[in-house]
Amino acid sequence: VWPLPQTVQMWLEYELLKNPTVPGYFCVSTSYRNEPNPVPGRHNLIFPMFEFEMKGGMDELIEMEQELLIHLGYDASKFIKGKYLDVAKEYGTKELENDHETKLYEEKTPSFFLTDFPEFTSPFWNMKRNDDPTLETANKIDVILSGQETIGSAEREVDRTIMVDRFKAIMNGAYKDKMYELFGEERTMAEMEEFLKFDFIKRSGGGIGVTRLIRSMKLEGLM
């Protein structure tokens, strides 16, 4: 067990950085989520996950996701994109919850692309933030299909210093403290240095909850 690659995402990112001439990598794995307050029909403890890493930033990422959905039969004319803070303001809340995802489905569309997540949602340490620092948002896209977040994706950071600083700061330092507790500071930071040796290219990646995707496709009459 290694400190940083606690999900397949880090391994895929490692492979892409190691072999930058390859357009991207993907795999299907089993994911385990210990949700503190699981909602029946929404949260599964164990589920299949399709994960991918690819070249390109936010524009290329959302283009790929839309092409995937079109290939699966989703209606492109119903695709709607909205920024997190704008949607939260519309629903009179600071933080979007499960009920808001359901409302997006019932009131707007079966295919909503939620973008630009604010810092208080604790975006991961290797997610790129908006080039405008005053916005304090991450280049993150959640694709809400039929009322449930089904694809979680983001553009990756390329600045080494920023990645180290964020690794130590996210969740007010709790993530870093947990890694140190489990694996030790020396081992954790040695692995970080190994990761940071690469020449970082513009890249993105994400995970698709296969169970939720199948659920949505059935609801939309696509399978």
Q: How would you label these PLM feature ranges?
A:
Residues 1-56, 63, 81-223:
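A translation/RNA-centric and nucleic-acid-associated enzymatic feature enriched
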Residues 62-73:
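Short amphipathic C-terminal alpha-helix that caps PH/PH-like domains
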